[in-house]
Amino acid sequence: MNTVKTVLELRAAVARARSEGKRIALTPTMGNLHSGHAALVSKAAQRADFVVASIFVNPLQFGPNEDLATYPRTLAADQEKLLQAGCNLLFTPGVEEMYPHGMADQTLVSVPHLSQGLCGASRPGHFEGVATVVSKLFNMVQPDLAIFGEKDFQQLAVIRAMVRDLNMPIQIIGEPTVRADDGLALSSRNGYLDEAQRAAAPALYQAIRQTAEAISAGEQDFETLLNSKKQQLQAAGFRIDYLEIRNADSLRPTTAEDPDLVILAAAFMGKTRLIDNLHLTRG
């Protein structure tokens, strides 16, 4: 596995692979990798001949009171995980490489509607930052396919819409959330949790799963169901950002007729914001 830091080096390496007829996959990350990231890269290696991963902590997607400065940078450990997972090329640009003209006047990519509400409501500008950096990476690499985790369900929806609307010839693949044995979705931010918080954190997925089970059993009073689960989460020590049931395709509020639903949640355990979701198809 080679590691490059400049767009010029990245494009040269990708061009060599493409000239050899290789199918190219991209997995963008912010580093501090866990086994969920490794699973994405392994899936990419199964679907493509040449796997590119990126590590870039993108300032554009962090709000003023978020953890940009403290987000863990663990490059050496990340390189080892990527190598073991089957990555061929790692791109680790600095901020000046990604935004050479500064961020104040950077052209931005905005995906309306899907970027609003849910995480977009509590993190203004977040998805604009995500869409912008991912579109830049797509232009730099021009992959045949890109793989993202379904844990960030709204982010995946935003990227799918961006690719569709901007006619990018890239296949977007969502991979199921990787979980710890107790159900907690793997996240780089889980490392912020202390021992007691980590023990309580699986209650988030439990509430989501119980919501899905109730709907599958025929429950139609979503408001009462969600209110009871919010109380359950608060009792477990969470401060709730949102817990909602949406149409899985449009992320609009669901109707009784929607066959394809997603239950989405974001909540704080101490100072750590955790997100999770569960996709549900009603027969």
UniProtKB/Swiss-Prot annotation:
(R)-pantoate binds at Q61, Q155. It is found in: Cytoplasm. It catalyses: (R)-pantoate + beta-alanine + ATP = (R)-pantothenate + AMP + diphosphate + H(+). GO terms for cellular component: cytosol. Beta-alanine binds at Q61. The keyword Nucleotide-binding applies. GO terms for molecular function: ATP binding; pantoate-beta-alanine ligase activity. InterPro entries: Pantoate_ligase (IPR003721), Pantoate_ligase_C (IPR042176), Rossmann-like_a/b/a_fold (IPR014729). Keywords: ATP-binding, Cytoplasm, Ligase, Nucleotide-binding, Pantothenate biosynthesis. The active site is at H37 (proton donor). Gene3D superfamilies: HUPs, Pantoate-beta-alanine ligase, C-terminal domain. Homodimer. Belongs to the pantothenate synthetase family. The reaction proceeds by a bi uni uni bi ping pong mechanism. Catalyzes the condensation of pantoate with beta-alanine in an ATP-dependent reaction via a pantoyl-adenylate intermediate. This is Pantothenate synthetase. It comes from Pseudomonas syringae pv. tomato (strain ATCC BAA-871 / DC3000). The gene is panC.
